[in-house]
Amino acid sequence: MVFLRFILLSILFSLCICASADNNSNYQNDKITETKSDISALDKWEAGTIVSEKSIEKYGIDRCFVIEKISDAIFGRMYNKSYKGNCSVSRGELRYIKILHRNINGDILLGEIVCNKHIAKDLIVIFRELYNASYPIERMILIDNYDADDERSMSANNSSCFNFRFVAGTKSLSKHSRGMAIDINPLYNPYVKRTQSGSIDISPRIGSPYANRNKSFNYKIEKNDLCYKLFIAHGFKWGGDWSTVKDYQHFEK
């Protein structure tokens, strides 16, 4: 009887060991698959994709903060959207930059920006410092994904730079038209203008809860904020300092 119990216990123990080994093997296989998927996203630079720290380490972080000329593929995404037929800026004056950023949950995302070549190096340095500090930026994909519709892009809290367009309500070209201005977390840092009739225009429209800068909320840019400090240190001006309007999302050179 004792011998039979010993045999049964031995069998049960062996089964537990096998199950544990299978679970570990499945876990390792899942991690390998996840890393391969991340590396594929990194190779293709699928902006907006969440990737792991391990994948970044394997891929190489220096490859994740890069300035490139506008390729045919990128220009194809932009043409007749952010880069309109009457655009006064040459394709050669623009640059495509790859960056990493984190959201409010600490996830790492692939980001992309089209900017003027004269601020490309500034942006690479700034965004790398923001990434190292885990500064939250929710989304950073080309505005062309929103058909260059500024309202839609801002409403999605998408940070963007180049877009050939006029200043809201005017016939003057925006600094965005040359890729010399960038908007960061625009939903939570809206454009606010008091009209002659006394009403207040807010862009994006759904950003109105964040027009009151006395409130505390995530993604808010203010003067003690790291994002503000870095852009100012690199010679940018902040729209939140303007007197006639307030553009809290906006930094320009």
Where are these regions (language model features)?
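N-terminal Sec signal peptide cleavage junction
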Residues: C18-S20
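Active-site acidic/histidine clusters and adjacent loop/turn architecture
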Residues: V89-M154
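N-terminal module-boundary/linker segments of secreted carbohydrate-active enzymes
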Residues: N23-R102
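Active-site-adjacent substructure of cysteine-protease-like catalytic cores
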Residues: D150-G179
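Bacterial N-terminal signal peptides
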Residues: I7-L15
